[in-house]
Amino acid sequence: MITPFPVAFVLLCFLNSFLLETEVKADESTQPEFFPLKGLQILTEMNPTQTEDGWEIVEGDIVLPPGSRRKQDKHQETKGIINILTLWTNGKVSYNFHSSVDDDLKEMIVGAMKEWETHTCLKFNEKALDFNYIRFRADKEGCWSMIGRINSIFAGQDVSIGDRCNRTNIIVHEIGHAIGLYHEQSRNDRDGYIHINWHNMPVARYSQFDRGIESPRGVEYDYTSVMQYGPMAFTEKYFQKNTIAALNPFHQTLIGSGMKISFRDSKLVNKMYSCSAFCPNNASQCQNGGFLSPYRGDNQPCHCVCQPGSSGEFCENINDPYEYYEFPPCGGNITSDAEIETPNYPTRKPPVDNCAWWIQAEEGKRVKVEFMDFSFHPRLDKNDSFFYRRCYHERVEIRTRNRYDGDMFCGEDIPPGTVATSAGREFIIIIDTNEQVMEGRGLKAKVSFIDEKAEQLSDLVLTSLLPTL
């Protein structure tokens, strides 16, 4: 049978996609390119490994202050810092702009700060000079920040919004670091939510996925956090292999999709800065994971901020069944013979985009899939591009060997009549796209189940269809 998703699908991201410009440093001849991906998909190669002053940059965009060493700092690498001395006093953050920041970028930075002010008790004040302050600048390479308030003593601490970083959600992300947030994928409890495909990255990059020691103040992991990197972070093969996989395949396309501050981002920062401490009703108990809104200094009671899927004065009402995340608009869990296809097949119409089919065989069986049609946006045909012949625009990840790692297909890679089987009891198909790049007819396939001792075809068939890059 096929278990359908809820009919009502609301995109978690209020923007469907953005174009992130990147340059791959491994190839000096590579020209800056645009590629369409959802949310925070920072290609970690766009940043240097150290600042021009020689300060180390870890996890892609976190600057370690002089005198600190990565291993020494790991004791406080949760999602939110635990050392109150690195929090901004009373939630007041002073800042100014370096002369390299033009008016358009200033407007974006101010907008990003307002996002944090709207959802927390933080206040950003522009000052030419202060004991501690943030200096936004655009003359450095890459997007990066230090974590929390650094005791700079009138010298200021830089937040770099360099070339290719002028995207609001990237700026929100870097400000997140400056107010004390680490990356979501660095949380100590991350293994309960994501799987790291170590074999898809160079050994030298393993340290980029070091974990912290403790969980961040009881706030659950969030795939849609503005602090979560995309699924290909630090991969050796962009648009071919993921490094981060959701334990639940239905959540895969949510990873790094955050276009704005999520509920759990705001909840964590409000806890870090004790934003409800002065609420007249701070003894009020919000239910079902809700929290009191930040106190605004007006002697008015604070209200409960309810997480997605709940409502009411005290968040007492919850949807049945309750889901924090919305599921992909198409796909489902398949446990018996079925025929699957993308919505509106053989055409593709917005706004439906991502799909996920999690096909599971019973004990003693394996999954068999016959592809009747496979038609998506072609592989990139710019032979001067680093991403030449890769699934640059949209991709269909097919996992036949295990739950967390597969190969990416697109165009008409899979001819009609192609038959593939799973190595074990699971066969997963995940379509990652958006309405701006959808092309082709989509996908249509027959699903059936065979004895586990039958011939295994997955590696012989699907892998052989991948082009040599």
Tell me the role of every PLM-derived stretch:
Residues 3-8, 278-469:
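Domain-level representation of secreted and single-pass membrane ectodomains enriched
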Residues 9, 13-105, 111-114, 120, ...:
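Disordered inhibitory propeptide/activation segment of secreted metzincin zinc metalloprotease zymogens
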Residues 66-87, 97-234, 364, 370:
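Metzincin-family zinc-dependent endopeptidase catalytic domain
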Residues 93-102, 155-162, 250-256, 353, ...:
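Short interface patches used for recognition in eukaryotic signaling and trafficking proteins
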Residues 105-112, 167-171, 223, 265, ...:
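Alpha-helical interaction elements in eukaryotic regulators
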Residues 110-117, 172, 177, 228, ...:
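Amphipathic alpha-helical interaction motifs in eukaryotic regulatory proteins
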